[in-house]
Amino acid sequence: MVVRPMMLRSSVAPGRQLLLSSARQRTASQWLSRAGASSRLSGQRFFADIKPPTTAAPTPATPSSESAVPPETVPKPSPAGQESTLPPSTPPTPAPKGGRFRRFLLYLLLTSGFAYGGGVFLALKFDNFHDFFTEYIPYGEESVLYFEERDFYRRFPNTLRNQNRLNPTPRDEGNKITIPSKSGLTSKVAEEEISGADVSQKGPHMSATPAQKSSEAQTKPAAAKPEDKTTAVVKAKEDKAAKEAEKKEEPRQPAIPAVTPLEFAQVNEGDEAIVQELVKTFNDMITVISADENSGKYSQPVAKAKEELQKVGEKIIAVREEARRAAQEEIQQAHATFDESARELIRRFDEMRAADAAQYREEFEAEREKLAHAYQEKIRTELQRAQEVAEQRLKNELVEQAIELNRKYLHEVKELVEREREGRLSKLNELTANVSELEKLTSGWREVIDSNLRTQQLQVAVDAVRSVVDRSAVPRPFVRELVAVKELAAEDPVVEAAISSINPAAYQRGIPSTSQIIERFRRVADEVRKASLLPEDAGIASHAASVVLSKVMFKKDAVAGSDDVESVLYRTESLLEEGNLDAAAREMNSLSGWAKILSKDWLVDVRRVLEVKQALEVIETEARLQCLRVE
């Protein structure tokens, strides 16, 4: 039910396009007719955005006449042609904000804009720079073309005024014939022209166009009958002479009214361009016939021609109605086709939905069977496990019973042995007492030997830790060696306290050796010397100056009792070379400010090394004390 309206709505759009395509094919292309327009603009087509109101076509006097456009129908100049050609003004510069980068970016944008505008101006003035600018500068060609078009519209503001006018189609009028003035005219017509004081009659005071049409209408009968040209001229001269004589001798006679002109043909239903053209041509013929004296004898043929013309208009209307009816039938047929397609689509959708429902049902049944099978397997497994537990419990009970039986058996055997000892082996107790004393002596010496062995092993483990700490090229963890020391200490509180005093990061990551401490101190000393030249609120310039001065600064000897950075560094380096890490760390700890902050990591490493060495010395001392206690 949702698809059908959408299908019907889509079927209406092609029907409208079919009806509008025939009207668009009859639309003529419109061209720019101004001589100043460029060749690029003259080759484009333009269509009217708004259809002008249709008015009754003026009846021309002759086929060669062209209808003049009244001044009120001339379209007003479009405001686009009168726009100012000045480029858009640059927006006012915002208030300067803090920050060098913002000012630099603002100046860069303004400079680029002025440079680009100057390039466009030079490209409009010089041809060589125009070629360079349009070829190598991005969007240069579009900018130059835009300003050229603006300049062209400024110089020719009426260029866009007549872009929707249709150029008159040239007509084949044949060879034009010029007839002398007053050729073939009678005295009656002359009198009518003389008596033209009536303002109700047509004349130059009403419109200049009908006079031109009448003059052109007079040329057509003369062109139609060239053999009567000479006779008409002679007759006109004789009539003129007789008229002058009558004026002198007799009084002026009243003018005879002119022949009543024939009515023009009108086809109200003929709104087609072809019908209007045919009516225009027929009216031209009526105008020519009306200009003749014997126009009365052509009234019946003209009336018959009007009827035929009306029939032609009716036939055209009938053909158009038939075409509209056929188009309506096609649209209805298309609607029916789309309705059938919509029903077919709905049917397919229902089939697909039913198929999907069946598939989902099958999948549901399959999934249900899988779940049931999984639950059955789970129940079977639980039962098997319960059975195994019961069997194991039974086995344990049997084992307990067997152990109890063995215990009873041993008790009975022991009682039997005691009885036997009381009888035959009375001296066995004395022998056992002697053996016990020997075992006590042996265990005492064994404890002494074990204590000495543990002390030696502890000393070896401490030496292994010291070798890892002092002889490794890179920091190496000594967790295994420290664990061995702790196991050999046999829960000695002194050794455990010494091991617990070591930082876990020291034996997990390792500690640097003395040479590494000295090498790192030299790198830290360089940075400390650089930082010693910086004030508290140092900026980028101060840091740069500190780096430069640290390169050229000379090292000085330590002065006794001096607390400056260079003296402290010199004393620390001397103590490190002597191997006195504790005193060196105390000297570096006396620094302050950035120097102390930069040497903080180095002090942490030195403290870790000192903690490990002190702990190892405590463990070695405890091992020696244990050896002395045993002795």
Swiss-Prot record:
Subcellular location as annotated: Mitochondrion inner membrane
Gene Ontology terms describing biological process: cristae formation
Topological relation to the membrane, as annotated: Single-pass membrane protein
Residue intervals passing through the bilayer: 104-124
One GO term describing the cellular component: MICOS complex
Compositional bias annotation for Basic and acidic residues: 225-252
Keyword Transmembrane belongs to the record: yes
One Pfam family this sequence matches: Mitofilin
UniProt region (Disordered), positions on chain: 50-97, 160-254
InterPro entries noted in UniProt: MIC60 (IPR019133)
Record's subunit section: Component of the mitochondrial contact site and cristae organizing system (MICOS) complex.
Similarity field: Belongs to the MICOS complex subunit Mic60 family.
UniProt protein name: MICOS complex subunit mic60
Species: Aspergillus niger (strain ATCC MYA-4892 / CBS 513.88 / FGSC A1513)
Primary gene name: mic60
